[in-house]
Amino acid sequence: MTQGICFILKPNMSIPPAFIEKETPFITRFGLWMAIWAHVLSGVATLFMVFPFANLKTRHFHIQQWSIKLLKIFGIQLRMMNPGILPSNSYLLASNHISWLDIHAINAFKPIRFVAKSEVEKWPIFGWMAKQLGTVFIKRDSSRHAHLVVGEMSAVLKSESVCIFPEGTSTIGEAVRPFKPNLFEAAVMADLPVYTLAIRYLSKATGQRSDVPAFVGDMGLLESMSKILKNRNLIAELTFFPPPAATPQQPSDRKWLALHSHEQIAKYLSSSNTL
């Protein structure tokens, strides 16, 4: 029987060499940047030459394969928890938000439509790609525009699942901010379940939560990409939770759905951080 080894670090105690994070060599990073731009160009070509003539199944195949390769370039391993609970029919997925990588980690598992902040649409190349993939863009802090987006989402949910990031911003992933309930109305209108997703990024070396992928503050996209390439060997962990069961005493409305999803993620992150 194989026994595990547990390291307990005390003050002034050094980290075992095997667990020290190693920075990616410059020459390797240069090659990875070349691989990224080649991969982006291949994605643009696919969007131009394949997507206009492809059915949904074919588009999903290309999206998944493109995302899998992107994660590989960045040295990110995908780990799923409870993926079998997701249904084959449409649903709304509510997730915490840490990084631009979140979208690609989810798509590498199972392609889905996203709702993203309107600023993403203005990103060079990547904004255009997101638009071609059917991303629904929302203006933050605009309740009027949110109402229009809810109508668009409910129409999309008739044939495809949709993922939202109800925090309205990204965080380092240590905790989850309160969820804004507006977009949950789309699931109520479409009479579809709301599944919850908790995202964490972990260091392969230590198994602990990593801030490296966090896309926060005034950080630019290229700056974030460079930071991740410099500190590769990460794990993107996706943990799925089932929808709540509505009762006559507690009907399913957007505020209740938002609160339930938030509590699931908050509880999970809190327990994970204490391990």
Where are these regions (language model features)?
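Soluble, non-transmembrane catalytic domains of enzymes that act on hydrophobic metabolites at membranes
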Residues: 1-20, 73-83, 101-103, 115, ...
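Residue-level preference for the first positions of well-ordered beta-strands
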Residues: 90-92, 159-165, 193, 237
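A membrane-cytosol interface segment of integral membrane proteins
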Residues: 136-157
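Catalytic core of membrane glycerolipid acyltransferases/transacylases, capturing the structured
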Residues: 42-54, 58, 72-73, 86-143
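Catalytic-site beta-strand/loop segments enriched in glycine and acidic/polar residues
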Residues: 156-184
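A transmembrane-helix-recognition feature enriched in membrane-embedded lipid enzymes
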Residues: 15-80, 128-132
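A cross-family acyltransferase "interaction/gating" segment
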Residues: 125-127, 174-251
